[in-house]
Amino acid sequence: MKIRFATIKDAPELLKIYEQYIDTPITFEEKIPSLYEYEQRIDNIIRRYPYLVCKSNNVIIGYAYAHRQMERDAYQWNAELSVYLLPDYTSRGFGKILYSILIDILKLQGIKNVYGGVTLPNEKSEKLHYALGFNKLGIYRNTGYKCGKWHDVIWFEKKISEYDPTPKRIKPINVINNEAIISVSYTHLRAHETLMN
């Protein structure tokens, strides 16, 4: 298994993974984005936030990324997380390791809180968030209509850093020390390998 930062060249493989969720309520998007549109999305995220891909046997099996939780400047110390895996690789610890590495990189950037939204029911994703120490914030009732029915979305929150009285602005991902990122990734990968053996 290898985890690295995503590039725009990964877009075709990432889009193929995402396509598998289009006909489900896991994403509220109803049409598959074009390859160009997906490339633009990746490009917009990697300018500021971590976007990770997980490879096994030289194939991308999943990806996870962080993005701005809300647009107003005072919200800049928050990030929302997303993770998508090929169906055969769910419930095997890959989502947990991707989320864990994302969170530790976000700490280096100065992020204070991370959030995750999960369309209900989704027991696997709920378990993932609780296992990583997220707290349930609340439920948006009947907030999305897809696949012929209304869906609730549960929101999770996790504090990942202390609240400074005068916080510094968030550091873009490209200014974070590479050695620190490698150290974070290595620690989580070793822990995952130990659990799998």
What are these regions (language model features)?
Residues 142-185:
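C-terminal "cap" of GNAT-fold acetyltransferases
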Residues 187-194:
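Conserved small/polar residues in nucleotide/adenosyl-binding loops
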Residues 2-16:
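A short beta-loop-alpha structural element at the N-terminal edge
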Residues 30-88, 99-100, 159-160:
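Acetyl-CoA-dependent GNAT
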Residues 120-138:
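Conserved active-site alpha-helix within GNAT-family acetyltransferase domains
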Residues 107-118:
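Conserved GNAT acetyl-CoA-binding A-motif
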Residues 91-104, 127, 131:
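Conserved acetyl-CoA-binding loop-helix of GNAT-fold acetyltransferases
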Residues 16-32:
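Helix-loop element at the rim of GNAT/NAT acetyltransferase active sites that forms part
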